Swiss-Prot record:
Compositionally biased residues, Basic and acidic residues: 836-853
Organism: Vibrio parahaemolyticus serotype O3:K6 (strain RIMD 2210633)
Source taxonomy: Bacteria, Pseudomonadati, Pseudomonadota, Gammaproteobacteria, Vibrionales
Biological processes annotated in GO: intracellular protein transmembrane transport; protein import; protein targeting; protein transport by the Sec complex
Region (Disordered): 834-908
Listed name of the protein: Protein translocase subunit SecA
Bilayer topology annotation: Peripheral membrane protein
Pfam families for this protein: P-loop_SecA (PF21090), SEC-C (PF02810), SecA_DEAD (PF07517), SecA_PP_bind (PF01043), SecA_SW (PF07516)
Reported cofactor(s): Zn(2+)
Length: 908
């Protein structure tokens, strides 16, 4: 009560922020007459002037009013568009490293030009981050004329660019790109072996468009660069055949109850578990199919891989649905559908064998499993920026999460014109069929009035279901979902036409406004070199249609189901009522919808259904509150999952920082001999201590063992026995120094032969390669640790603490292994004379030619045999090999250095 009273008197925090910013808006507006009087050249010269003032110590905040006034004036001259005062406020919020919540149609793209220009002045680069390639290219091309007018360069960062083009793009003052590509470039840079192969420079300032989508919806998705692991496609196929034999059990097993089903499904957490009966039955099937030994159990350490395959296959069949979670494209590939945007994500694959299990289920080609080479979450990537800001139409519901995880405050920016959209209360039906019938009736009414309608669905399957119903009712419509997103811009351009009906999944043309009366720009673009008269005629025609749509009630939004997040519902509603236009929205629900089925109480469900007749709908504030409560519950749970993910990933992130800093150090110095020398001393000391314990008696020394170990691991012939015989006063400390000195001496001799520079380059290369290999193995070990850590809870231990402790031990092991492996390689490397190298190279070439000739002859013989179509007389004689058979994993005799199976073994 007191809080409400105080808010009334002094205003909310948001109101106070807006009041403060409006004072600066007045300051910017005061510059307008002066800047209007400047010539184009004088206005362009402002950029140089601002940069000079920055060098003299002026701050960006001090320059802000003039810089914003410069951009506004340039925009008027280049586009004929003047930034509204609310856009100036939005620009200031972004510059302060905060989140600006701006409604759809309020011009977020133009707003971003203000802080982008200001923060590009120091020359460190600004990244404007969008959700897809189309928006990155569109926004870059839209804003390029404005920035180039002001003397700034603009770049685009999208997938599959040549390395040099990407490097040049990163040198631009303002770079537009997708969140995925920025993250992957960071990972790729940290896998590069030469500085010139890196593309990114420092991460100074980022403006994230659709910030809720990137930092919240996708926060749980790590970016992973992976390489192929071993092939196990046959196992996926064989286990896939077992899953249809399993039966679902509705209730979990407990002490009092043991069902006869084989698995249970937890819809809330999207998990599937084998029951005890299921485990026994699966074991029986595996034994029968020769995949497991009789009497063995699925949970024995030797069968971990089998368990992994069974779980993946079970999840693929039970939890993942075609045309909802994924589609199978024309090339027979399983392509993931983003649950938040409804877009397909080509190139992305589920991990932990799930993708292969889905491929086996669909009967398409099974790709190899992958091994993680480098990984980071969006949460951790974007926290690397010195200053981070974001824009979205819907952030207020997640303001707490932005603040607690990213330290970003959300400021709600007022609309330029008051919002007059009519948001009608939800209507609930008993069944989905009744709900769809009501939606069709509503659409018919709107079409008859000439009112455009956008229907939002939660999946491709639902959008196609509704599309079929509309076809039966003979209602012309467009479908915008992951299957047709190439036509997205075209469909969105027509969605505001009188009587147009558009069905869309969550993607709902996000980032693209639905303009009432259709897009006149699209019509102009379809003409070749249009004249001014043609453009004026198109605009006049558009104005007529625009007014006609407004009279019919503007864009009507129909939601066919509530989403798990209120924010996504608000995004759908936000498509209508842009810039003060008329509009309306309504959600149609049924008791069969997943949100109502899973999250509303049984009492509420039976209460609703008991008083309802077929086709009858219920509208009630109590019900709307109950639905909102269910959504809050889901949002809370998802927030906890993301927070927990971050806490676990923070552990890996700290380790990632150490490894990448070490990599940076290695990349930026030419001489790491001091580091190598220190590592050699540490490694040899540790080994000597194993065989000659500190402060021990000579009887406890294992001299022979030490000599053998030094020879085997470091190719070091240390005559320790002889030294001890020659000097009976040689104690452990002096002996240690003598061994280390000998190792240094031997290494120096190699340096004299090959030259210091060659050896320095070799040291650096070995160190980088070893670090990358160990980091890759460490990531796999961390994955395994993470997957099983929750079981520690059963032993009354805190899983999070245990994870931190064990991952730290693993990391210490990595650092120790790095030292040992590098010193081992450097010690065992043999230096050969040039003549010897040339002789070996000649020998290798001759072997390669001989192997190629032999392979060619075999190939020709095989072709001849096929061409003849019949066996020759002696074809049934056994082939006698006149040389030793080469093993698959042995080096190829051609001398390529590859394994036989990966070289000429493939031909054979």
């Amino acid at each position: 009560m007191i809080t409400k009273l105080l808010t009334k008197v002094i205003g909310s925090r948001n109101d106070r922020t807006l009041r403060r910013l409006r004072k600066i808006v007045k300051e910017i507006n005061n510059y307008e007459p002066t800047f209007e009087a400047l010539s184009d050249e004088e206005l362009k010269a402002k950029t140089v002037e601002f940069r000079e003032r920055l060098e003299q110590g002026e701050t960006l905040d001090k320059l802000l009013p003039e810089a914003f006034a410069t951009v506004r004036e340039a925009s008027k001259r280049v586009y004929g568009m003047r930034h509204f005062d609310v856009q100036l406020i939005g620009g200031m919020v972004l510059n302060a490293g905060q989140i600006a919540e701006m409604r759809t149609g309020e011009g977020k793209t133009l707003t971003a030009t203000l802080p982008a220009y200001l923060n590009a002045l120091p020359g460190k680069g600004v990244h404007v981050v969008t959700v897809n390639d189309y928006l990155a290219k569109r926004d870059a091309e839209t804003n390029r004329p404005l920035f180039e007018f002001l003397g700034m360069t603009v770049g685009v960062n999208v997938p599959n660019m040549p390395p040099q083009a990407k490097k040049e793009a990163y040198q631009a003052d303002i770079l537009y790109g997708t969140n995925n590509e920025f993250g992957f470039d960071y990972l790729r840079d940290n896998m590069a072996f030469r500085n010139e192969d890196r593309v990114q420079r420092e991460r100074f300032f980022a403006v994230v468009d659709e910030v809720d989508s990137i930092l919240i919806d996708e926060a749980r998705t790590p970016l992973i660069i992976s390489g192929p692991a071993e092939d196990s496609s046959e196992l996926y196929t064989r286990i896939n055949l077992l899953i249809p034999h399993l039966q679902k059990q509705d209730k979990e097993d407990s002490e009092e109850y043991r069902g006869d089903g084989h698995y249970t499904v937890d819809e809330k957490s999207k998990q599937v578990h084998l029951t005890e009966t299921g485990q026994e039955y699966v074991e029986e099937l595996l034994v029968k199919n020769g995949l497991m030994e009789e009497g063995d159990t699925l949970y024995s350490p030797a069968n971990i891989s089998l368990l992994h395959h069974v779980n993946a296959a079970l999840r693929a069949h039970v939890l993942f649905e075609r045309n909802v979670d994924y589609i199978v494209n024309d090339d027979g590939e399983v392509v993931i559908v983003d649950e938040h945007t409804g877009r397909t994500m080509p190139g992305r694959r589920w991990s932990e064998g799930l993708h292969q299990a889905v491929e086996a289920k669909e009967g398409v080609k099974i790709q190899n499993e992958n091994q993680t080479l480098a990984s980071i979450t969006f949460q951790n990537y974007f926290r690397l920026y010195e200053k981070l800001s974001g824009m979205t139409g819907t952030a207020d519901t997640e303001a707490f999460e932005f603040q607690s995880i990213y330290g970003l405050e959300t400021v709600v920016i007022p609309t330029n014109k008051p919002m007059i959209r009519n948001d009608m209360p939800d209507v609930v039906y008993r069944t989905e069929a009744e709900k769809f019938a009501a939606i069709i009736e509503d659409i018919k009414e709107r079409v008859a009035k000439g009112q455009p309608t956008l229907v939002g669905t939660v999946s491709i399957e639902k959008s196609e279901l509704l599309s079929n119903a509309l076809k039966k009712a003979k209602i012309k419509h467009n479908v915008l979902n992951a299957k047709f997103h190439e036509k997205e811009a075209e469909i969105v351009a027509e969605a505001g036409m009188p009587g147009a009906v558009t069905i869309a999944t969550n993607m709902a043309g996000r980032g693209t406004d639905i303009v009432l009366g259709g897009s006149w720009q699209a019509k102009v673009e379809s003409l070749q070199d249009p004249t001014k008269e043609q453009i004026d005629a198109i605009k006049a025609e558009w104005k007529k249609v625009h007014d006609q749509v407004l009279d019919a009630g503007g864009l009507h939004i129909i939601g066919t189901e509530r989403h798990e997040s209120r924010r996504i519902d608000n995004q759908l509603r936000g498509r209508s009522g842009r810039q003060g236009d008329a509009g309306s929205s309504r959600f149609y629900l049924s008791m069969e919808d997943s949100l109502l089925r899973i999250f509303t109480s049984d009492r509420m469900a039976s209460l609703i259904q008991s008083g309802m007749e077929e086709g009858e709908a219920i509208e009630s504030k109590m019900l709307s509150r109950s639905i909102e409560k269910a959504q809050r519950k889901v949002e809370g749970r998802n927030f906890d999952i993301r927070k927990q993910l971050l806490e676990y990933d923070d552990v890996a992130n700290d380790q990632r920082k150490v490894v990448y800093e070490l990599r940076d150090e290695l990349m930026n110095v030419d001489d790491i001999s001091d580091m190598i020398e220190q590592n050699r001393e540490d490694v040899l000391t540790a080994i000597i201590d194993e065989y000659i314990p500190p402060q021990s008696l000579e009887d406890m020394w294992d001299v022979e063992g030490l000599q053998e170990r030094l020879k085997a691991d470091f190719d070091l012939d240390a005559p320790i026995k002889q030294w001890l015989e020659e000097d009976d006063k040689l104690y452990e400390e002096a002996l240690r120094e003598k061994i280390i000195s000998l190792a240094v001496e031997v290494y120096k001799a190699k340096e004299e032969v090959v030259g210091a520079q060659v050896l320095r380059n070799f040291e650096k290369s070995v160190m980088l390669q070893t670090l990358d290999t160990l980091w890759k193995e460490h990531l796999a070990a961390m994955d395994h640790l993470r997957q099983g850590i929750h079981l520690r809870g059963y032993a009354q231990k805190n899983p999070k603490q245990e994870y931190k402790r064990e991952s730290f031990e693993l990391f210490e092991g990595l650092l120790e292994a790095l030292k040992t492996d590098v010193i081992t390689v450097l010690s065992r490397v043999r230096v050969q004379q040039q003549e010897e190298v040339e002789r070996m190279e000649e020998q290798r070439r001759a072997q390669a030619e001989e192997a190629a000739r032999r392979a060619q002859a075999q190939h020709a013989a095989a072709e001849n045999q096929l061409a003849d179509g019949e066996e020759s007389e002696g074809s049934n004689q056994p082939v006698v090999r006149d040389e030793r058979k080469v093993g698959r994993n042995e080096p190829c005799p051609c001398g390529s250095g590859k394994k036989y199976k990966q070289c000429h073994g493939q031909i054979n």
